[in-house]
């Protein structure tokens, strides 16, 4: 599944990033690499997603979220 399909409050593990190299490198600099845990904090109607990665909150657009493949992990209660 893609990060865009994720549910608010759930944790996911990044399996693969299928984006152009420039965007992929930027995400890696922000700490998002294969195996990283990502928690979705908000999913805006516009398509942008606010998430927490390695203790840092940031937002990404719909196109980027659709290029990040994840596997569902533990739920945040």
Residue spans of the language-model regions?
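Ubiquitin-like/PB1-type beta-grasp interaction modules and other compact soluble beta-rich domains
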Residues: 1-6, 60
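Short, conserved secondary-structure segments in the cores of folded domains
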Residues: 2, 26-28
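C-terminal structural segments of small proteins and small subunits
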Residues: 12, 47-77
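Conserved hydrophobic positions within beta-strands
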Residues: 14, 37-40
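Short alpha-helix capping/helix-loop boundary micro-motifs
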Residues: 23-26, 36
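Short, structured beta-strand/loop micro-motifs enriched in basic residues and often containing a Trp
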Residues: 10-23
């Amino acid at each position: 599944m893609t990060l865009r399909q994720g549910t608010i409050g759930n944790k996911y593990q990044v399996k693969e990033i299928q984006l152009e190299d420039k965007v992929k490198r930027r995400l890696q600099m922000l700490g998002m690499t294969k195996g990283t845990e990502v928690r979705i904090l908000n999913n805006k109607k516009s398509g942008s997603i606010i998430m927490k990665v390695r203790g840092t909150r940031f937002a990404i657009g719909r196109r980027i979220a659709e290029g990040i493949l994840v596997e569902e992990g533990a739920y945040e209660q």
